[in-house]
């Protein structure tokens, strides 16, 4: 069927900010879909609140609205734009839920907007647990016995009839939020109570646990003519019971017989046909390893994290084709863009193995609950491709960037057998490493399979890796063993460790004996047809398929897996850099390991290498491609850390040079540079041990800010107010970087702001100054940022511009740099300089209309700012006000404290723009789902040093009609200043403490600040946790509360007698 001509204008809903469970894969899907629809000649209108994505660039759709994805704003845009149709299946759970809400409120009918791709009934059937159960029974597809409950008591009664363990799954939540496995009634009560609160329809499904079955996923496509096919099947290394987003996954599935594959394939295809889904769909199944019994676990009637993985694993662009199917095209009419010759009706065939390993945020959250279950906790993932399981698994391990270069963590050798086996049985994020250690200790694959229900096939592969380790140890310098090790994915560094030599010597030995990798193409058809995609992976074998072209090339290093502190913003910069390289007439080559992002879409660059970002893997590509140079400043800390080893190996680093990167990163050199340039910074010292730190702090005076040098995202950074806390910090955090000392700085409580600058070595362009709403001490990535600045005087802005120019020229910056300042009493201090693109690049690029990463790349390749038409200095500011606000994923991470400080905790961001500060703030709060009603109660629990300031806020809340509650000390302070607050009890005062008021819905907002003694704050932590679990807005910085007050004041009426 040809494409539809009765619709012209289509609206696409994006997925909003990045949170755990909904990450960059939707930026990739949405970008592909919008371009795919434009290619067919439709007018595309996009709504998405996330400025950090490629998807919200002007070129992606005909009209891009960066507005909150809420009923209020989406309805406004629908009324204004009047599209013919709406495509909701590319915006993750956010997009689906929005479509449901628009439909239930009658907006779609009123405006005559048709839903494309997936019918509402199908969304309902797949998402509503009851309807899903009915449909499966009709299709005679087996599902675990289950019951829908709306109260805790119903749950307990049902569990009594089927027996424990049971699984709780709340309806309409994302990434398993609020669900979990329960081994007894106590756990069931706890999890169900929480799950009912988090489900928008207060219902949960209680089902028999089938933990221990194999978890298999099928990614399927269907069109309007009922053609359906399987794009890819995938098998989880971890059995059922661990969320698939937190599992190690292999594609294609490895341990199923042909019969089992056909059985599950038929089930998946019959389900997508019954749901009449037009587009992509993901079916998760559980297979009993000991019989041919299986269960259907769930169906996602949309593009998902698994479909991004399947697209990258097979090269088959699911989202692009889903968009074409949505407008009526069929699979036998669309050409597969990978081969350029076969139709999309061909099922992909793979002649390689793909491994995906999740990346978790626990390096940032040491207190976080690391046990894995049905609720997702990973922030991102890596993927690696190899010719065997060992190779793809080991390549994926070294892509993770958690300080490992093999499937082993050396410290585990010291763990006792009992502790080891406990970690093998009770899965945490690092279980793979514990299982590998158990094998090294001589536990047999059979024993481990019995304990973990991991298939023995995979455990044999781990045993094979260990056998090769032993061979290497027994035969140093042996070329045959070296070849075997390389064929199985071993890194030079691991081989060097076992041989007692250096990585460099192993590399030399390889090169002398021509043991080098070849690069194979990902072509969807197992090399059956010629393919035109330049998408490659390395392996040790015959025939290299990546042919170097005659054109001069430039290699751009990506930023690896998404984690806190290094998010999709860096991928954005990478993609823009590639566009500029191509525009300058070079061949652009990308190297990256993240399957979720736009940069690893094969149509973005001239060549894509899907490889770990390590020195060895990057050098192999450089040896083959011989590029003009490498650009490292867009890949975050990942790429910057590779600059020095690459330069030592004689590689040309384009842009700011290594010596100058060092001057910005190394503390002593940086201080010296600032002295020479006559720029003030807060007084500080370096310390290598506890005593030196204590001395430094006494000399500078408390409070001090302590942190290791060379880190991203404020890892292990703290504000310390007394010597006792300082000593405990030195004992726990110095491990963060043994070679690099700890920095001790005077902590200046002032107004913080930051600047991104672009320099060609002569002139410096400053697109804008962003002012932080939270005062210094909250990490810049967790602060709300406002552009243009609202409170900085002209003199301060001129000083900032002047210091920025001096620094850019003085540090020989070529390309991008980011500088953070703190201002106190009109005096400007420099806090830090990052000689690379920062996480504010996408936001600033969008609000100033300067494509910053592209401009920077053009400068790196030799053009000047004046040639590109930009002036020296601060760019004229916009008339509208734009706010970048952080979004957190605390609901997903038990035991992580939500108190904001110098260590970054947010996973994503949203943007609010309008004519005034108050309106822009309102949009930013709405977009980040911090909704405050216009009346209700606010509770204050404030540290002594902030009580004065809080009193003023409390008065203003009272003036607009809010009720004020406060904890004992705070209430007494308010009363002595003539403000009556209703006191609330201490934690543990049943029914009178804050958590119980929160549970009863009597509190609309909590304002909680923490004083100098961090140790005595367990109460505060419980209060903050209760706010997060019940979705009550929580402010741990008075400045954010003040911003929210401005919004409420601008929206409220004051009643006064005359």
From Swiss-Prot:
Cofactor: binding details: Binds 4 Mg(2+) or Mn(2+) ions per subunit.
Binding site for Mg(2+) 2: 298, 300
Carbamoyl phosphate synthetic domain: annotated span: 547-929
Catalysed reactions listed for this entry: hydrogencarbonate + L-glutamine + 2 ATP + H2O = carbamoyl phosphate + L-glutamate + 2 ADP + phosphate + 2 H(+)
Region of interest: Allosteric domain: 930-1058
Spans annotated as Oligomerization domain: 402-546
Nucleotide-binding found in the keyword field: yes
Protein residues bound to Mn(2+) 1: 284, 298
Name of the protein in question: Carbamoyl phosphate synthase large chain
């Amino acid at each position: 069927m040809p494409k539809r001509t009765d619709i012209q204008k289509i609206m696409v809903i994006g997925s909003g900010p990045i949170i755990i469970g909904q990450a960059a894969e939707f930026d990739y899907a949405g970008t592909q879909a919008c371009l795919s629809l434009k290619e067919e000649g439709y007018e595309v209108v996009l709504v998405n609140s996330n400025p950090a994505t490629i998807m919200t660039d002007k070129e992606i759709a005909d009209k891009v609205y960066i507005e909150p994805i809420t009923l209020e704003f989406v309805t406004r845009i629908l009324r204004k734009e009047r599209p013919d149709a709406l495509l909701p299946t590319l915006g993750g759970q956010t997009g689906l839920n929005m479509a449901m809400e628009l439909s239930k409120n009658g907006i779609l009918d009123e405006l005559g907007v048709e839903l494309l791709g997936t019918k509402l009934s199908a969304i309902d059937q797949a998402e509503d647990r009851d309807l899903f159960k009915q449909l499966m029974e009709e299709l005679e597809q087996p599902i675990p016995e289950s019951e829908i409950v709306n109260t805790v008591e119903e749950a307990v009664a049902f569990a009594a009839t089927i027996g424990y363990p049971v699984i709780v799954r709340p309806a309409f939540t994302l990434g398993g939020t609020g669900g979990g496995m329960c081994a007894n009634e106590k756990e069931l009560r706890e999890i169900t109570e929480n799950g009912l609160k988090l489900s928008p329809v207060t219902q949960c499904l209680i089902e028999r646990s089938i933990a221990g079955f194999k978890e298999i996923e099928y990614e399927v496509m269907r069109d309007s003519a009922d053609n359906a096919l399987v794009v890819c099947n995938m098998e989880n290394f971890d059995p059922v019971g661990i969320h698939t987003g937190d599992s190690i996954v292999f594609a294609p599935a490895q341990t199923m017989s042909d019969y089992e594959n056909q059985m599950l394939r038929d089930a998946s295809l019959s389900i997508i046909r019954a749901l009449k889904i037009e587009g992509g769909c993901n079916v998760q199944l559980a297979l009993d390893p000991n019989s041919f019994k299986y269960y259907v676990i769930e169906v996602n009637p949309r593009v998902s994290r698994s479909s991004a993985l399947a697209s990258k694993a097979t090269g088959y662009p699911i989202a692009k084709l889903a968009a074409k199917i949505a407008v009526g095209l069929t699979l036998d009419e669309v050409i597969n863009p990978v081969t350029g010759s076969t139709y999309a009706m061909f099922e992909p065939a793979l002649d390689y193995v793909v491994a995906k390993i999740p990346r978790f945020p626990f390096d940032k959250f040491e207190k976080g609950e690391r046990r894995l279950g049905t609720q997702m906790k990973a922030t991102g993932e890596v993927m690696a491709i190899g010719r065997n399981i060992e190779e793809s698994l080991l390549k994926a391990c070294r892509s993770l960037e958690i300080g490992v270069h093999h499937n082993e963590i050396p410290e585990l050798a010291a763990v006792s057998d009992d502790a080891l086996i406990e970690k093998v049985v009770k899965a945490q994020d690092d279980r793979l490493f514990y299982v590998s250690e158990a094998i090294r200790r001589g536990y047999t694959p059979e024993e481990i399979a019995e304990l973990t229900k991991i298939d023995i096939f995979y455990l044999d592969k781990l045993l094979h890796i260990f056998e090769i380790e032993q061979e290497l140890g027994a035969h140093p310098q042996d070329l045959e063993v070296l070849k075997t090790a390389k064929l199985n994915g071993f890194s030079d560094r691991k081989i060097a460790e076992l041989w007692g030599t250096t990585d460099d010597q192993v590399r030399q030995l390889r090169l002398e004996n021509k043991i080098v990798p070849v690069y194979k193409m990902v072509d969807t058809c197992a090399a059956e047809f010629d393919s035109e995609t330049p998408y490659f992976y390395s392996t040790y074998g015959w025939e290299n398929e990546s042919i170097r072209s005659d054109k001069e090339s430039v290699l751009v290093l990506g930023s690896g897996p998404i984690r806190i502190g290094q998010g999709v913003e860096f991928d954005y910069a990478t993609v823009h850099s590639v566009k500029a390289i191509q525009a300058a007439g070079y061949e652009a080559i990308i190297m990256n390991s993240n399957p979720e992002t736009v940069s690893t879409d094969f149509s973005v660059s001239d060549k894509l290498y899907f490889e770990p970002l390590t020195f060895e893997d990057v050098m192999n590509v450089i040896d083959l491609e011989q590029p003009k140079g490498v650009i490292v400043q867009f890949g975050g800390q990942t790429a910057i850390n590779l600059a020095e080893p690459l330069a030592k190996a004689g590689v040309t680093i384009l842009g700011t040079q290594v010596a100058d990167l060092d001057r910005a990163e190394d503390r002593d050199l940086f201080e010296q540079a600032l002295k020479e340039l006559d720029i003030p910074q807060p007084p500080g010292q370096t310390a290598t041990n506890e005593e030196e730190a204590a001395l430094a702090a006494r000399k500078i005076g408390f409070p001090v800010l302590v942190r290791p040098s060379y880190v991203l995202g404020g890892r292990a950074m703290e504000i310390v107010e007394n010597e006792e806390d300082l000593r405990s910090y030195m004992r726990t955090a110095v491990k963060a970087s043994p070679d690099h000392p700890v920095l001790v700085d005077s902590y200046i409580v002032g107004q913080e702001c930051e600047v991104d600058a672009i320099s060609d070595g002569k002139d410096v362009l400053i697109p804008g100054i962003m002012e932080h709403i939270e005062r210094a001490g909250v990490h810049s990535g967790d602060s709300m940022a406002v552009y243009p600045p609202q409170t900085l005087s002209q003199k301060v802005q001129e000083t900032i511009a002047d210091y920025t120019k001096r620094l850019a020229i003085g540090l020989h910056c070529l390309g991008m740099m980011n500088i953070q300042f703190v201002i106190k009493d009109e005096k400007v201090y420099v806090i830090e300089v990052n000689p690379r693109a920062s996480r504010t690049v996408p936001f600033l690029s969008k609000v100033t209309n300067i494509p910053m990463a592209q401009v920077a790349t053009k400068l790196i390749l030799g053009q000047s700012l004046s040639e590109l038409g930009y002036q020296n200095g601060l760019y004229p500011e916009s008339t509208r006000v734009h706010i970048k606000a952080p979004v957190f994923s605390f609901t997903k991470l038990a035991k992580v404290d939500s108190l904001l400080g110098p260590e970054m905790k947010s996973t994503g961001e949203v943007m609010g723009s309008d004519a005034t500060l108050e309106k822009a703030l309102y949009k930013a709060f709405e977009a980040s789902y911090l909704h405050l009603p216009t009346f209700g109660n606010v509770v204050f629990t404030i540290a002594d040093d902030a009580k004065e300031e809080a009193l003023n806020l409390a008065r203003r809340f009272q003036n607009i009609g809010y009720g004020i509650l406060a904890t004992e000390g705070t209430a007494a302070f308010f009363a002595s200043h003539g403000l009556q607050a209703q006191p609330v009890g201490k934690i543990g005062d049943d029914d009178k403490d804050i958590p119980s008021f929160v549970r009863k819905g009597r509190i609309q907002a909590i304002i909680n600040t923490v004083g100098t003694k961090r140790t005595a704050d367990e109460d505060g932590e419980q209060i903050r946790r209760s706010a997060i679990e019940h979705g009550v807005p929580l402010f741990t910085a008075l400045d954010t509360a003040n911003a929210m007050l401005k919004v409420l004041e601008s929206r409220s009426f004051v009643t006064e007698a005359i």
